[in-house]
Amino acid sequence: FVSIYAPEDLISVLNARTFIFENQFNKALAQGLLAGVSENSGLLLRPVKKSEVQVLRNKKLRFEQEILYHKVLDLVGDLSLFVQELPMAKIRIHNGGHIVHHQIFKRLVKYVHSRYPA
């Protein structure tokens, strides 16, 4: 659970590193999609249990919820591609990702247009 009410609440979100799961990494590597990627580019993860992961290559999370915070950073970044200013909103996401973020944006646009017709 993450709440962002003020700019200072974004500090942890902005410090969250990107990540990739080991199976996705190996597939992308085999396809030649990781040119320029180094061990410092982000976190390499291996699923352990349903909601647990192991961080590989002797790295540690900067803080307990770093993976969750990176997902929030992805959401804010994806929505910011479409608008300069985000409205106050309460957004709940389970298993989010870039496709889900685009769906949220479409719903936000529909809502704004219904409330404030041109």
What is each residue range found by the language model?
Residues 1-118:
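Short acidic-hydrophobic catalytic motif
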